[in-house]
């Protein structure tokens, strides 16, 4: 059975005087597993925060059976798209409302990931973090198609321009990943997982390293990353969900 050893979460706006359009789901027990997520409302449109809140509220309502079917991720995104589309019923100006969403469900056999947009999932591997999801941005699409190398786009515009999000107007394109525990667990049976919005991972990627003891501890990681973000001055709303899980029975942890 999967156990939650520790977790740490933060979410704060780019500026204290403006609304935070990120919405966060801290690790939540769902059946025998744990569900966590970040939704980043697309800030250039009215209703961005309502769209991200709508996505998280739907995830909170889910029962364990929602994650069992082979098309579970698709069904979840379809239902959230319906709810985001219906936001126009409460305010016609929300017609263009959109949000990204990245969620992880750590179940009995592995971690199921559903991803739309440009939040990211990272896993700790040895002494570094490995990016698991792909950004749904124009830059990443050009790289995937072999038209450019990452170094060639470093100074080009459009880095944060999305080609997929959950919206009434956009065709839904999502990434689904399943990671078995025997693929990702450390030798002690633990898994360290991180979900970050773009406001959090851009400062991380400027110097993607902390002491291994910091990577092992969600609270220390969150505190250090937050200090870095504040020191560099936030460029967007900033959100992090960091967790450490184990597949070992509780008694084995003290052997």
Where are the language model's segments positioned?
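PP2C/PPM-type serine/threonine phosphatase catalytic domain
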Residues: 1-255
